[in-house]
Amino acid sequence: MKLNKKERQKLLQQTISSTPFITDEELATKFGVSIQTVRLDRLELSIPELRERIKHVAEKTLEDEVKSLPLDEVIGEMIDVELDDQAISILEVRKEHVFSRNQIARGHHLFAQANSLAVAVIDDELALTAKANIKFTRQVKQGERVVSKAKVASHDKEKGRTVVEVNSYVGEEVVFSGDFVMYRSKQK
């Protein structure tokens, strides 16, 4: 039995609500309509496309996990975190990140991405950078994507310090590396 538009849209909302990662193609098959019809229904109902739904779910999950700073204070887009273990963020280098005369990224943006990731990976309400040993290994240009990966290297429970190693890449090439000694309030 074919559903009318109102019924289909109601079921579409329920389906996406319960299964946010369902594709338009899967929805079209489920409801026996074209992909374009599903897209028009989503548009009418103000339901974002799959990519935006995935991003929203990921942000909500990360927001619940990251304790040391609000997600909007992480420089770049945080895509993964396992507290006191590892984290990953992506920074798309845009016009506002570069020098106007040569389109080379300003170093403080790369440092800020790495430092905020080092803070975010700490499983504590308070995490501060006590010391950083950093190295820029190549210039980054406008339009490049910097993937920053943080890994907790060690804990000194007595001193309340955690060492976080951060490497930032454009493709396979390391463009920045740093060891961040992080102060934390809890001795975990």
Curated annotation (Swiss-Prot):
The keyword Transcription applies. Transmembrane segments: none annotated. The keyword Chaperone does not apply. GO terms for molecular function: DNA binding; DNA-binding transcription factor activity. One of its GO terms (biological process) is negative regulation of DNA-templated transcription. Keywords: DNA-binding, Fatty acid biosynthesis, Fatty acid metabolism, Lipid biosynthesis, Lipid metabolism, Repressor, Transcription, Transcription regulation. Signal peptide: none annotated. Transcriptional factor involved in regulation of membrane lipid biosynthesis by repressing genes involved in fatty acid and phospholipid metabolism. Belongs to the FapR family. This is Transcription factor FapR. It comes from Bacillus pumilus (strain SAFR-032).
